[in-house]
A protein has these predicted regions:
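Glycine/Thr-rich phosphate-binding loops that ligate phosphate moieties of nucleotide
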Residues: 1-178
Length: 178
């Protein structure tokens, strides 16, 4: 099952291109690590090209709120990511109406950053699993299909077997932040 947060990586890239010109992602990650513990209060509604699931709205637009003159661009970057992750969390909570979600498998461009993965674990309040397998999304779809065909008792069993040859990195939520 997949949910949609429209243009989340595109919004991150846009922000970095416009506010961190000339900096590479390693430098940006370091800024996030340095600022992660800071409570700044900036809020971001990340609807740069509308809102995806669970409350589709093609006319929704992005906004940064709760801003004062002490804010810096780093506060906006952190709030952008938190806004994206909160949108994903709302999708996870929607899925929980149908099945327990004890941990979340993550993949994609933003998962190359340890600090962003930790931010996600903290926002979702769940353990995250990042597979070393670059095609983990395809394996997830295969596990669902094989479970429905009766090959495996559950998607989890299928993923465990299919991804056995790869390594995984786990991120655990900080209970104080979750």
């Amino acid at each position: 099952i997949e949910a949609s947060v429209l243009n989340c990586c595109t919004a991150f890239n846009w922000f970095c291109r416009n506010f961190y010109e000339g900096m590479d992602y390693e430098q940006i990650n370091q800024i996030l690590e340095d600022r992660y513990e800071k409570e700044d209060g900036v809020l971001c509604l990340p609807y740069f090209q509308g809102r995806g699931t669970p409350k589709w709205n093609g006319n929704a637009r992005a906004a940064f709120c709760n801003i004062n003159l002490s804010m810096e661009k780093h506060d906006f970057l952190k709030s952008l990511l938190e806004g994206i992750f909160l949108e994903i969390k709302s999708n996870i909570e929607l899925l929980e109406a149908y099945a327990a979600v004890n941990h979340v498998y993550i993949s994609g461009g933003l998962t190359k950053s340890n600090i962003m993965n930790q931010m996600q674990a903290d926002v979702y309040g769940r353990k995250l699993c990042l597979s070393d397998e670059s095609e983990s999304t395809a394996y997830g779809a295969l596990a669902v299909a094989l479970k429905s065909l009766g090959v495996y008792a559950s998607e989890e069993e299928g993923l465990e077997i299919l991804l056995k040859r790869t390594g995984n990195t786990y991120y655990f939520p900080d209970e104080e932040k979750a």
